[in-house]
Regions:
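Acidic, low-complexity proline/glycine-rich segments
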Residues: 3-26, 41-51, 107-108
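Alpha-helical scaffold segments that form or flank carboxylate-/histidine-based iron centers
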Residues: 35-46, 66-86, 128-135, 160-172
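Conserved catalytic-core motifs characterized by acidic clusters
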Residues: 21-34, 55, 60, 189-193
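Preference for long, well-ordered alpha-helical segments
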Residues: 53, 135-215
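Conserved alpha-helical segments that form or flank metal/cofactor-binding pockets of metalloenzymes
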Residues: 67-110, 182
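Carboxylate-rich helix-loop segments that flank metal/cofactor sites and access channels
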Residues: 15-26, 89-133, 195-206
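Acidic/histidine-rich alpha-helical segments that form the ligand environment
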Residues: 39-60, 108-161
């Protein structure tokens, strides 16, 4: 009776035993859990995408037909491998709902594949310019994915994931520009190998033109 009378007389709603306070605590817990699940879904999506990309880069390296551009592909493969390890570490440490990264990735794979098979199904033998074009497409997809993850983590107050996503975004932002500048040279090289008379200076000229467009 005394507890009921205190509420009736306007007890402080912020006090630990007040029903309103309990309601707020429960609501905050639910919101926090939903936020964690939202971030976790982005993390597993990016992990699935990185895995597909890494397999593609490995396939191109094994194929060994890209010659002087192999160093670019190896750098991409190294970045992807590093990203996978970092995403695995944070996902396994948090273990959403008792579910580790291996199980979560199974559910994320179909979602990521829906983003566009052409962007990530790169394990095939293609001519060099098309390989680099598809690499560029995949890395660009990963870049915007990390931008979304960084923004989501910032908005929901997850500093750890925010910083991780930003670090990976920086890696791929540089890689995108490296690929962008490699494509003209790859096209000119390919045309020369096909027997066309080409101006070897064109690649450098195109890159300078493109730099003006971007910057």
């Amino acid at each position: 009776m005394m507890l009921r009378d205190n509420y009736a007389q306007g007890a402080d709603p912020s006090s630990p035993g007040h029903p309103a306070r309990a309601t707020h605590v429960i609501r905050d817990l639910i919101v926090s859990q939903n936020a964690q699940e939202t971030i976790a879904s982005y993390v597993t999506d990016m992990r699935a995408l990185e895995e597909h990309m890494h397999k593609a880069f490995a396939g191109q390296i094994t194929d060994g037909k890209d010659g002087k551009f192999n160093s670019v592909i190896r750098e991409l493969s190294g970045l992807s491998e590093k990203h996978i390890a970092a995403l695995d570490e944070i996902a396994d440490r948090r273990k959403q709902g008792g579910q580790g990264i291996a199980e979560a990735i199974k559910g994320a794979a179909s979602s990521v594949l829906g983003l566009g098979a052409a962007a990530i199904d790169l394990v095939r033998s293609e001519k060099l310019p098309k390989n680099l074009r598809d690499d560029y497409t995949a890395v660009s997809l990963a870049t915007v994915g990390y931008l979304m993850l960084h923004t989501t983590a910032e908005a929901l107050g997850d500093a750890e994931v925010s910083e991780l996503a930003l670090s990976h975004l920086r890696d791929y932002a540089k890689a995108v520009m490296t690929l962008f500048h490699a494509v003209p040279e790859a096209v000119v090289t390919f045309l020369g190998e096909e027997g066309f008379a080409v101006d070897s200076k064109v690649a450098s000229k195109v890159n300078k033109t493109v730099d003006k467009v971007w910057y």
